[in-house]
């Protein structure tokens, strides 16, 4: 009888004891917060942005556990380890480490702009860690937009350095004017511009400049064939693009030619921040992506 009581008590204690908590994730490159319950989805914002760009996305899609990534040095976050060198690539490695160490079960990954670059990095370099990827308005080689046909990372180094230097050396007035013009060209929904502008203004000038130069020189086209997860790419032509819709579609098809299974879809009547300019369309695309 005593043995039975002892075993019963041990069983009760085992059930009542809390599971061992996961060690908190520590990084000097990214800060991650989680919202909701359900299948895991990693959301990565773009250059000089914050997870605030995903607020409506989270609201529109209950039933998922969203992992909101904030890069150090952007939108008021401490610079941390992003003091020198590349910004996107090291942060992408930290996202992959986060997925592994926090035991996420092959999450979906959605990245906007530079976040899209990082999503492709994770998918190509850690293909077993993700289930599917959505890239929001980003090419595998952004530098192609900054030079003549046939430009390479090597040939664009002077351009990238010139842009980096001009961003770092801009005074307050010049920086404010540049940010206002840039945001106006990226978001046609006027009411949504202040959010993105505030994030950009709060970003570290040097970190943003190095990240932009890094994006110009990052050519992921040779790595696309390493992506085994389904890839969806949403893109826009944009008001200021000196090309037709058909030309932009052709440009994206050519850029992703080594990944023929990728789903490429142009979103009309939108600039770079599709989630702001076409919120209903964007919500529908994300819903289809997550459910597929």
Residue ranges and their predicted role:
Residues 105-147:
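Conserved hydrolase catalytic core segment
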Residues 2-42, 61-65, 105, 260-263, ...:
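Alpha/beta-hydrolase fold catalytic core
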Residues 133-169:
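Flexible "cap/lid" loop of the alpha/beta hydrolase fold
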Residues 270-279, 283:
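Catalytic histidine-centered segment of alpha/beta-hydrolase-like enzymes
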Residues 60, 230-231, 235-270:
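Conserved loop-alpha-helix segment in the C-terminal half of the alpha/beta-hydrolase fold
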Residues 35, 67-110, 114:
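Active-site loop/oxyanion-hole signature of alpha/beta-hydrolase fold enzymes
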Residues 30-80:
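Conserved HGGG/HGGXW glycine-rich cap/lid loop of the alpha/beta-hydrolase fold
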Residues 145, 150-151, 166-225:
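Conserved alpha/beta-hydrolase catalytic His-Asp/Glu region
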